[in-house]
Curated annotation (Swiss-Prot):
The protein's name in its UniProt record: Nitric oxide reductase FlRd-NAD(+) reductase
Requisite cofactors: FAD
Protein species of origin: Aeromonas salmonicida (strain A449)
A GO molecular-function annotation: oxidoreductase activity, acting on iron-sulfur proteins as donors, NAD or NADP as acceptor
The family this protein is said to belong to: Belongs to the FAD-dependent oxidoreductase family.
Gene label: norW
GO CC aspect terms: cytoplasm
Pathway(s) where this gene product acts: Nitrogen metabolism; nitric oxide reduction
Pfam families in UniProt: Pyr_redox_2, Rbx_binding
Reaction catalyzed: 2 reduced [nitric oxide reductase rubredoxin domain] + NAD(+) + H(+) = 2 oxidized [nitric oxide reductase rubredoxin domain] + NADH
NCBIfam families for the chain: PRK04965.1 (NF003437)
Subcellular location: Cytoplasm
Length: 388
């Protein structure tokens, strides 16, 4: 294995990245654009293959296999970016004082360390929930690909962004889909209920059974294949597959064991540095200014800023107003800014095929917006009006 390059002081010059998801690979690309020679090592528990994670919400309608999602193998990515890749190598711990990462394949020294450990799919607190399908990675899809392709009756637990995308995608392929959420409407963390009504209508028009204000009380494996699912109102149904899409939980175990400050995520400052010197965090695992930002655009901007910082030019992360896109083809949505809050006054324009909803503060300033259906072209003009 290639040894780490040492500085004159005997400290490794290597930038070591733990993880191989979008954040890790985007950081590698950003570093390479700025410096063709900087030693970089990426350690990952999987193969390190590059794929497009948002495609996971649409694999059924596209008939896409897990293998076909791979854009570039880990070894090809490493060769292309001229980095040292250590695949299939779980990390056991971090020693910040010695600047050492301990793994199943031995110890690796670092000059700067980046935690890009991502987040894991949350599961309901129920017996047997570990057997539910989650689709948070290519590996998870590969493990469940057979049951997903064969299932006719599918229950999706969670009507957030991913849950709605999955439900519509699977229904468009002729599956019998039930969408369950404790909230009274879909996308409840993003939208007022009234603005989700066209999306609800679009889901129903594709045959999705919407069960809001309800959770799952019990999941029982059936003889042979399938599940008997009991909702919190006592009703039961037979399902071939149950998918949990109730959010993400940042992977914090390594950071906690190393003594780094954590809350919901790994706490970072504006330079994305953790509470320990020479250790940074990026992506779904990081908590910046009190926020978790599990979206692609802030990760790209974070990777660009962090690359400059790691190469000697301190660059604080600043985020402009950013679009969140809900890829539900029968009724797509885009939103940005602040779209939840009792203090917001909404100005809405509806037609039979779309909506433009503007959220304004008491002084009339635009705070956020939602566009839906055939009104997508209104998104960017409104985005430019949001305060930066």
């Amino acid at each position: 294995m290639k040894a780490a390059t040492l500085s004159e002081a005997g400290v490794s010059r290597e930038i070591l990245v733990i993880g191989s998801g979008f954040a890790a690979q985007q950081l590698v690309k950003s570093l390479r654009k700025l410096d063709a020679e900087q030693p970089i090592r990426l350690i990952t528990a999987d193969s390190g293959d590059e794929y497009n994670k948002p495609d996971l919400s649409h694999v059924v309608s596209r008939g896409c296999t897990a293998a076909a999602m791979t854009r570039l193998s880990g070894s090809d990515f490493a060769e292309q970016q001229r980095i040292a890749l250590v695949p299939h190598c779980p990390v056991l711990g971090i020693d910040p004082a010695r600047r050492i990462v301990m793994t199943v394949q031995g110890e690796f020294a670092y000059g700067q360390l980046v935690l890009a450990t991502g987040a894991s799919a949350a599961r309901p607190d129920l017996p047997g929930s570990e057997q539910l399908v989650t689709l948070n990675s290519q590996q998870e899809y590969a493990a469940a690909e057979g049951p997903i392709q064969q299932a006719r009756r599918i229950l999706v637990l969670g009507a957030g962004l991913i849950g709605c995308e999955l439900a519509m995608d699977m229904a468009s392929d002729g599956r019998e889909v039930t969408l369950v959420d404790l909230a009274d409407s879909p996308l409840s963390a993003l939208l007022p209920a009234v603005l989700s009504q066209p999306l609800q209508q679009a889901l129903r028009s594709q045959g999705v059974s919407l069960q809001f204000g309800l959770g799952i009380a019990r999941i029982d494996a059936q003889p042979g294949d399938g599940w008997r699912v009991t909702l919190t109102d006592g009703r039961t149904s037979e399902q071939d597959l149950v998918i949990a899409a109730i959010g993400l939980k940042p992977n914090l175990v390594l950071a906690q064991a190393a003594g780094l400050a954590v809350e919901r995520g790994i706490l970072v400052d504006d330079s994305l540095q953790t509470s320990a010197p020479h250790i940074f965090a990026l992506g779904d695992c990081a908590q910046w200014r009190g926020q978790l930002l599990p979206f692609l655009q802030p990760i790209v901007l974070g990777a660009n800023a962090l690359a400059r910082t790691l190469l000697g030019t301190p660059t604080p992360l600043t985020l402009p107003p950013m679009l969140v896109k809900v890829k539900t083809p029968r009724y797509p949505l885009q939103l940005a800014g602040r779209t939840k809050g009792e203090d917001l006054a909404w100005q809405c324009r509806w037609n039979s095929h779309g909506l433009v909803a503007e959220a304004r503060a008491e002084d009339g300033e635009l705070c956020g917006f939602v566009v839906g259906g055939d009104q997508m072209s209104a998104a960017f003009p409104l985005l430019r009006q949001l305060p930066r």
